[in-house]
Amino acid sequence: MEETMAEEGCCENVESTFDDGTNCISKTEDTGGIESKRFYLARTTAFEMLRDRGYEVNEAELSLTLSEFRSVFGEKPELERLRICVPLRSDPKKKILVVFMGTEPITVKSVRALHIQISNNVGLHAMILVLQSKMNHFAQKALTTFPFTVETFPIEDLLVNITKHIQQPKIEILNKEEKEQLLRKHALEDKQLPYLQEKDSFVRYYGLKKKQVVKITYSKEPVGDFVTYRCII
């Protein structure tokens, strides 16, 4: 295994082929309604993303088929029924809420209404908004009034799980002790590591914060694995 601090692209544009041999086109072929298919794909990816972030996700949610989804939610799902609220495995008192927003433009008024609506939800420490419309600058600023981090994802970004791509490298998030051990081993400061920006799609998927470090392993036949580390900036 080759280990390096050198710069290596983590998120290059690659042809959309997945582990099961399908591509984006074959993944989305369907004779049913488009609206229910979009919600099904986005909600499934949201569950997978939460699981990968360390939240407790029921296996039944991950294995739900499109036909089963439609039998539960219908062809035109009610947005409130699509909401997800799951606890953190390491601290079940902490919960994250995923809210699917409507197609109307998101304004300060709608953000404030949501704030009031979820104010009695005990234990929330994070929230994700799945957007079907644009959010203006003032509405984005209003999100900072929440007592926890609020992330936003356009629904289009969740139609495919980017971590399932056949050419996607293995990503491991280092904890504080592992990060310190790495820096000592190579006599480095975190700012000297190659970096990934917070807006990077993989950083957003895992919900990583500034100064966190990830280990990235590329499988390169026939020479074996290639390892690099990145710091979030």
Swiss-Prot record:
Family annotation (InterPro entries): Arch_Rpo5/euc_Rpb5, RNA_pol_Rpb5_N, RNA_pol_Rpb5_N_sf, RNA_pol_subH/Rpb5_C, RPB5-like_sf
One MF term in the entry's GO annotations: DNA-directed RNA polymerase activity
Entry keyword annotation includes Lipoprotein: no
Highest taxon of the lineage: Eukaryota
Gene Ontology biological-process entries: DNA-templated transcription
Annotated GO CC locations: RNA polymerase V complex
Keywords tagged on the record: Nucleus
Subunit-level organization: Component of the RNA polymerase V complex.
Protein name: DNA-directed RNA polymerase V subunit 5C
Record gene name: NRPE5C
